[in-house]
Amino acid sequence: QGTIGIEQLAEHPVMLTPRGTTFRDALDQELAASGVRLTSAAEVDGLRLLASLAYQGYAPALLPASAVSGYPEGDWSLVHVEGLARRSVGLVRNRRTTPSMPSRAARDVVLEVIREIAPHQPGIHVTLGG
């Protein structure tokens, strides 16, 4: 596992998700603020398909770390891109109502799975508050 800066990344064509997808739009906005523009080797709809193509060696791909977990070791490597903000994932509920028992049970299971599995996933940083 290595590290590359966003300026270095811009020197190479990479496979990306298409414009109009949440991940790509957030990425383009963040890179534009840094004055960096990427060259697309291909635009592929679907993070798992994009990860699979990169794993098979078609071209490097820019993906969230969660999209590449589970691939066996081989002739590929996970490279951290410095200069990109970490993405956050949250669990949202309405504060004006009391959560139902099934909602609370689902929340508890989600938190348990995150605490158990996420720390073992490369590139995933757990920041649970409670």
Predicted regions mapped to residue ranges:
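C-terminal regulatory/oligomerization modules of transcriptional regulators
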Residues: 126-130
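Residue-level signature of the cytosolic catalytic core of signaling kinases
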Residues: 2, 19, 23, 42, ...
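Short, charged, surface-exposed secondary-structure boundary motifs
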Residues: 1-2, 26, 71-73
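Secondary-structure junction motif
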Residues: 5, 13-34, 99-108, 114-125
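Residues that recognize and position ribonucleotide moieties
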Residues: 2, 7, 42, 60-61
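Beta-alpha-beta core module
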Residues: 8, 48-98
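Short helix-capping segments at alpha-helix termini
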Residues: 33-36, 71
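Short beta-strand-to-loop elements that line the ligand-binding cleft
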Residues: 16-17, 36-49
